Amino acid sequence: AQFYNVSKARIYGAEVSTNGVCTFNPNTTLSYNLGYVFIEPEDAGYKKKNEEEAAYDDPMHMKEKSNTSKYLKYRQKHTVKAVLDFQWKRLTLGTNIVWKSKTLAVDYLMVDERAKEQPEIMDYVRDILFGNVNGQTLHSYWAKNNTPYCVVDLRAGVKITKELSFQFMVNNLFNKEYSTRPMLVSAPRT
């Protein structure tokens, strides 16, 4: 497999965030950090690259990415994050919430999202490399699971003394299965 550098990448976007602390009384506070990120991760040379790849006559010649879109590989357009911490006397309760939109493109070696009338040689190569169990392939897994996702972490703590405190944390509270790239399934609840 040969991998290519993108000759003309353009990534632009916007980020908005706010943070603060709400003090309800001397013993009770809520701190927050909220944010949103939008990016438009473009390969400015994608049209030329797609034309070159369409002209390939060697069925084993590698394409660069999983689809013909203008987007760079392994990027999501939207991310929303929230960190909230509530403190009452010696007790704390907090959460991290992250929502991300689907991944826009991945490596062609892993997945081919292009529409086609019949399988290509690379589809069989992928089955050999990554497996095909009862019709479940890396491609079918990716097609089903490359969706927007939200992950929630939860933490609780108690301050025993000035120097001693205990914290309990649950990552991925709802045990959401998500994948940011093929063959990299997220960690389950911990």
Report each predicted region and the residues it spans.
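Intrinsically disordered, low-complexity coil segments
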Residues: K47-S66, R114-W142
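Gram-negative outer-membrane beta-barrel transporters
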Residues: Q2-L109
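Extracellular loop and loop/strand-boundary signature of outer-membrane beta-barrel proteins
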Residues: Q2-V6, K65-Y71, H139-W142, D153, ...
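One-face residue pattern on beta-strands with alternating periodicity enriched for small/polar residues
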Residues: N33, K81-D85, T92, D153-K159, ...
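C-terminal beta-signal and adjacent terminal beta-strands/loops
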Residues: W99-V125, L129-Q136, T147-Y149, G157-T190
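Transmembrane beta-barrel architecture of outer membranes
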Residues: K77-K81, V151, T190
